[in-house]
Every structure is written in C-alpha cells, then in structure tokens.
C-alpha cells in the first residue's frame, strides 16, 4: 500500500502566523501523500468575544449554541481553513479545504443530551473514504476543518482530534496510514513540567499503568484513547509530537 500521513494541528500552532508558517513549510516537505486537519478554537473564541458572544466551556469542551455555531463555521471553514489552503498553494501543494458537508465526505449525529447539552456538536457516523482517497490519488492535499454535517442541512462543530482519527481510520482501507498529532509538547511526558521527559513508545498496557499512577491525565487520556482506536482500526502508526519536530524521528509512538 502507498503511504499516507494524516497530520492534526491545533492550539497556538494555528493561531500564531509565524508558527503556522513554519509548520506548513515542514508539512510541505513530508514525502508522499498527506492530509492536514486543523483546529482553531482560540481564534473562534477571540472572534466571538469581539461580536459580544460568550464562549461557554465544560471540561475544556465548547458548548456550541446557534450563535456560536455561526462563529465557528465562519472561523474554521473560512478564516483558518482558507489561510492554510492559500499558504499551502504558495508552497506548491494543490490543497483543497473541506468541511464534512463538502462533497458529503463526513457525516455526524448531533450529540445527545446527557449530563451536559453540548448543543450543535457532532459525533461522527460516516466517512466517504473512497471520495477522499480519489482526491488524494489525483494529487490533492485535503485540508480538513473541524466541522461536519448531519445530512439534514445542519452544520455541527466536531473535535479536530476526532476528525483526524476518523479520517485516518477510514483511509487505512486504501493507504498505509500514519496519524500524527502535533501540539505544544514534544510528546507524551513522564513529567508534565519537563519537556524532555518524552515517553518514546506507549503500548496499551503501559498506558493503563500510567493512567493508574497519574502520570498520564487530563486531555492526554482521550487523545491516547483515540490513538489506540485508530491502531485497532487499521492505522499503522500514531505519533504524538511537537509541531517543530514534524518530519523528524521524535515524539511518542503509539502501537
């Protein structure tokens, strides 16, 4: 199978122009076929504030009411996505920006209300992997925004890590897929205050041991759960690394 790299970027990397420029330059130099998935939550919060719309969060997750949905659609599908696409075009990549509604490549169900009503948030139910694979095969570099749709005319805010994981899993039918999560740390750390304490490789038993000991906690737990789900679904390798280490043999490998 031909190799494909699916890379997810978010946080400060997307928000700061100089950092994003450097990352996209590194991304453009990665050999073979590739897909970029981006976040943009901080930009959405900043624009919402300017518009007088309060951003509500529960455990780090955005509550997406009707007004907030308008903002995240504008910011993710417009401002952030198209800036990235234009930058990649300038670097010689034939990039195409997509939300799940575009070409109906990814559908979701609106998350049911349980303890918390997250509003217009989507849980992915279907990925048109053959469509994405066809685009990739023609030399297109998909740039995926963290938005899906329900097939009934409604856009849904969807976690970028989830978009990356679901796309990687679906595309593993067509390619030998490596999934890379880029963020501000060098990888999964033994000591969150020591950026050099990177755990080079994590297996499921080691993950469970580190969770019990409190070494791995917070937002890293769902990120690793998504990583193991991707491996179980056919993704060859998952890497968690720092953005400026992209393309290097570094970070934490999940097997």
Residue ranges of model-derived segments:
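C-terminal catalytic "cap/lid" subdomain
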Residues: 1-255
């Amino acid at each position: 199978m031909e190799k494909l790299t699916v890379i997810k970027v978010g946080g400060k990397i997307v928000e700061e122009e100089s950092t994003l420029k450097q990352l996209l330059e590194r991304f453009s130099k990665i050999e073979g076929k590739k897909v970029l998935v981006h976040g943009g939550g901080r930009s959405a919060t900043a624009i919402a504030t300017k518009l007088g719309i309060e951003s509500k969060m529960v455990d780090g997750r955005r509550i997406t009411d009707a007004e907030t949905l308008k903002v995240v659609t504008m910011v993710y599908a417009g401002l952030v996505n198209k800036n990235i696409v234009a930058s990649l075009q300038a670097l010689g990549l034939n990039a195409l920006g997509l939300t799940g509604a575009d070409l109906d490549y990814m559908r979701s169900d609106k998350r049911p209300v349980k303890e918390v009503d997250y509003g217009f948030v989507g849980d992915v139910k279907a990925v048109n992997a053959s469509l994405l694979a066809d685009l990739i095969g023609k030399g297109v570099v998909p740039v995926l925004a963290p938005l899906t749709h329900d097939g009934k005319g409604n856009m849904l805010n969807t976690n970028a890590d989830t978009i990356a994981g679901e796309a990687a899993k679906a595309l593993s039918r067509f390619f030998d897929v490596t999934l890379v999560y880029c963020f501000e740390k060098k990888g999964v750390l033994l000591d969150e205050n020591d950026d050099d304490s990177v755990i080079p490789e994590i297996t499921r038993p080691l993950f469970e041991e580190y969770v019990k000991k409190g070494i791995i906690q917070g937002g890293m737990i769902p990120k690793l759960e998504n990583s193991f789900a991707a491996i179980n679904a056919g993704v060859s390798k998952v890497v968690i690394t720092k953005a400026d280490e992209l393309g290097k043999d570094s970070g934490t490998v999940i097997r």
